[in-house]
Amino acid sequence: MGSKKDSNFLEKIAKRKFPYIIAEIGINHNGNLNLAKKMILSAKKSGANCVKFQSFVADKLISKYAPKANYQKKYKKTQLELIKSCELKTESLRKLKNFAKNKNIEFLCTPFEIKSLKDLIKIGIPAIKISSDNINNTPFLIEVSRTKLPVLLSTG
């Protein structure tokens, strides 16, 4: 749950004289932990203050009948299979968080549903980033509010 330390996350950003740069890694690691670590190192080397990943359970978000986006059509897998291959399990997220901490770069992760939110709370995140597609998801936002963590809210 939220703590004084967690509220310092937003204070730390607000009191800066320079922009706070969050490197969006998202799912570009393709489910590969080593690639994700290389991306963290690249973000750090580029001057980012923070890296941000995405956490989700594909089966809870995507129908097995969902059509593929244009860029996905070259693959034989379904959209669900493609996105599922980018999932990071809780233990992988914990490893990435610890790796980022050891490299002195902040770790954030956007949860897309309640299970992912609860998993991120278990590994200890300083804030919750809400994606714009969840901005009207009242049950999810209620769960987020119960964490008492600072929230970064995308609007589009």
Regions found by a protein language model. Give the residues of each.
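Glycine-rich, proline-tolerant flexible connector loops at the mouths of alpha/beta enzymes
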Residues: 49-87
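Short beta-strand segments at enzyme active-site cores
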Residues: 22-23, 48-60, 106-111
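Active-site beta->alpha loop and helix N-cap motifs at the rims of alpha/beta catalytic domains
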Residues: 73-138, 146, 150-153
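Short, acidic/polar
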Residues: 32-43, 111-119
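Conserved, mostly hydrophobic/aromatic
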Residues: 24, 43, 120, 154
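Active-site beta-loop-alpha junctions enriched in small/polar residues
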Residues: 26-28, 56-58, 112-114, 133, ...
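N-terminal amphipathic alpha-helix/helix-capping segment at the start of soluble metabolic enzymes
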Residues: 1-23
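Catalytic domains of carbohydrate-active enzymes, especially glycoside hydrolases
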Residues: 38-56, 123-124
